[in-house]
Amino acid sequence: MEQQSSYNKEELLSCGRGELFGPGNAQLPLPPMLMFDRITHISEEGGAYGKGEIRAELDVKKDLWFFECHFNDDPVMPGCLGLDAMWQLIGFFLGWTGGPGRGRALGAGEVKFYGQVLPTAKKVEYVINMKRVIKRKLYMGIGDAHLYVDGREIYSADDLKVGLFTNTDNF
């Protein structure tokens, strides 16, 4: 499989159907839980630690599913969905680098929210800086992440961990 450096929505949906990395390997969730529309850049080099970087975007639209229910008359994207997108991207990175197994979020260090995504926003950008990729019995990625809305940073998460598992029976 040839590695691409960017992915469009249809390619991300293909990953969600298990077609991109093969059966039993890393998959993205399908909508509505897929929290980005495109990966604009992915590389095993670069980033703040020289271990890789992922950049992705979500187009904000007033009719996104969560605005209707979170909250009544006070629509805001749930912070946990932005955090989940960061884990989704690290899992994608692990599959993209050839890691076997299904992705599972394993934890986070410090998470900070200092802004919000409102229906009036235009674009969310996620930036993940990989700190470490372990390619042993457990295939695991650790990264620091930032979420920007219309160019302003509003979330950060340190030491996000995602593992790939070939068997999740005892997980």
From Swiss-Prot:
Q: Which GO terms describe its biological process?
A: unsaturated fatty acid biosynthetic process
Write down the InterPro entries for this protein, in alphabetical order. FabA, FabA_FabZ, HotDog_dom_sf
Q: What is its EC number?
A: 4.2.1.59, 5.3.3.14
Q: Which gene encodes it?
A: fabA
**GO function terms (MF aspect):** (3R)-hydroxyacyl-[acyl-carrier-protein] dehydratase activity; trans-2-decenoyl-acyl-carrier-protein isomerase activity
Q: Which HAMAP family match?
A: FabA
Q: Which UniProt keywords apply?
A: Cytoplasm, Fatty acid biosynthesis, Fatty acid metabolism, Isomerase, Lipid biosynthesis, Lipid metabolism, Lyase
Give the reaction(s) catalysed: a (3R)-hydroxyacyl-[ACP] = a (2E)-enoyl-[ACP] + H2O; (3R)-hydroxydecanoyl-[ACP] = (2E)-decenoyl-[ACP] + H2O; (2E)-decenoyl-[ACP] = (3Z)-decenoyl-[ACP]
Protein name in UniProt: 3-hydroxydecanoyl-[acyl-carrier-protein] dehydratase
Classify the main location. Answer: cytoplasm
Q: Which NCBIfam families does the entry link to?
A: fabA, PRK05174.1
Listed GO CC annotations:
cytoplasm
What's this chain's function? Necessary for the introduction of cis unsaturation into fatty acids. Catalyzes the dehydration of (3R)-3-hydroxydecanoyl-ACP to E-(2)-decenoyl-ACP and then its isomerization to Z-(3)-decenoyl-ACP. Can catalyze the dehydratase reaction for beta-hydroxyacyl-ACPs with saturated chain lengths up to 16:0, being most active on intermediate chain length.
